[in-house]
A protein has these predicted regions:
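Short beta-strand segments
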Residues: 81-83, 106-111, 142, 169-171, ...
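Glycine-rich beta-alpha junction loops
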Residues: 37-39, 112-113, 170-176, 223-225, ...
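Thiamine diphosphate
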Residues: 41-114, 273-292
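Glycine-rich, acidic loop regions that bind phosphate or pyrophosphate groups
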Residues: 109-150, 251-354
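Active-site diphosphate/adenylate-binding microenvironment
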Residues: 17-21, 35-38, 43-45, 356-398
Length: 398
């Protein structure tokens, strides 16, 4: 007697892979960067049945950097997808980079079937354990019913508080299983309460008074301003107070470098006059920075002549590298909005004149030669030809 064919799933049921992709759609995802493999094939097939655009990259490291760039450029959560084993481990450098740069990212990896996890199955790597220290959080999905909740939590964790990468590892059998999904509308994570601190009125009045009393104030602006979408608030502050600005590598773009008050980048690879200004300032307003060693050099010598006010959304950054006279845990956008309502119109002509002397004495310059094409010359020529409108991507080589 012929065996009866398996009954088709009930109409309301969905395959695990489709549930995951539908969860992405519900989070507003429009683009996924991925490279398919055996353990993630179900997910990629589900993508073809969705409205999400899949950008096929040549390598998993390339895909996660593409997702990171997308997140930085758009302000949205970047999403990438890879298979198990070597596919997952190829994401490691990108995850570490996103963690260091506080970039919101959700990385989804396929995994070997649940029944063979821990048995050295083909292309099995414990990617959750491998990435635990370089992600904001990670998940190993062990029930198909948990997929909608986990994806919603992953996006919430990646994009709130101090942003960062979240990894979701999905075994192949979970992708192939069926269930009736329940998509949550809200997120409730008892163990995760993202810091939404807002600077107190008293603290911001103290900052405003410090600015009023200062003779040589300086704003030290970092990537936290970009993450908080607070560039307009920073520019409003500078327009009102006329305080010079230095920027970290991660903070480039928060203030126009063509503005006379911009001292460009600070630190090892920054301008001489930006570093001189740090050393001579009597008040350093550190906004959304981490006092990175490439900026500070010897910590005991950094900004040792001035009072330091450090505002950051992550309390763990306060006093971690450099002890501040006034550390404030706050969303920088909120803090700047409050500060803009308290500061008075001011200017520091003597301080700016002193900085301009350094600027003239130590400009960014190079000597053109007929024998060689210097990198500086190539960049200068490209800038002139494109009138500054081109999007240029670079590595970090010398």
């Amino acid at each position: 007697m012929a065996s009866a064919a398996a009954a088709p799933p009930a109409p309301q049921e969905m395959r695990g892979a489709d549930i995951l992709i539908e969860s992405l759609v519900r989070e507003g995802v429009e683009v996924v960067f991925g490279y398919p493999g055996g353990a993630s094939m179900e997910l990629h097939q589900a993508l073809t049945r969705s409205t999400i655009r899949n950008i096929l990259c040549r390598h998993e490291q390339g895909e996660i950097f593409a997702a990171e760039g997308y997140a930085k450029a758009s302000g949205r959560v970047g999403v990438c997808m890879a298979t198990s084993g070597p596919g997952a481990t190829n994401l490691v450098t990108g995850l570490a980079d996103a963690k260091m740069d506080s970039v919101p990212l959700v990385a989804i990896t396929g995994q070997v079937p649940s029944s063979v996890i821990g048995r050295d199955a083909f292309q099995e790597t414990p990617i959750v354990e491998i990435t635990r220290q370089i992600t904001k959080h990670n998940y190993l999905v062990d029930r198909i019913e948990d997929i909608p909740r986990i994806i919603k939590e992953a996006f919430h964790i990646a994009s709130t508080g101090r942003p960062g990468p979240v990894l979701v590892d999905v075994p192949k059998d979970i992708q192939q299983s069926y269930c009736v999904p329940e998509f949550p509308e809200t997120v409730s994570i008892r163990s995760y309460t993202p810091n939404l601190s807002q600077a107190s009125r008293e603290d911001m009045e103290t900052v405003a008074q410090a600015i009023k009393e200062s003779k040589r104030p300086l704003v030290y602006a970092g990537g936290g301003i970009i993450a908080s979408n607070a560039s307009n608030e920073l520019r409003a502050l500078i327009q009102k107070t006329n305080i010079p600005v230095v920027q970290t590598l991660m903070g480039l773009g928060v203030f126009p470098e063509t503005d006379p008050l911009s001292l460009q980048m600070v630190g090892m690879h920054g301008s001489v006059y930006a570093n001189y200004a740090i050393n001579h300032a009597d008040l350093l307003l550190a906004f959304g920075v981490r006092f990175d060693d490439r900026v500070t050099g010897k910590l005991s010598e950094f900004a040792k002549h001035g009072k330091i006010i450090h505002i950051d959304i992550d309390p763990s950054e306060l006093n971690k590298n450099k002890v501040a006279h006034l550390p404030i845990a706050s969303d920088i956008k909120y803090a700047l909005q409050e500060l803009n309502g308290l500061v008075e119109d001011s200017s520091y002509p003597d301080w700016v004149d002193e900085i301009n002397v350094w600027r003239k004495k130590h400009p960014f310059s190079f000597e053109e030669t007929e024998d060689d094409i210097l990198p500086q010359y190539a960049i200068k020529l490209l800038y002139e030809m494109t009138k500054g409108e081109a999007i240029v991507a670079t590595g970090v080589g010398q």
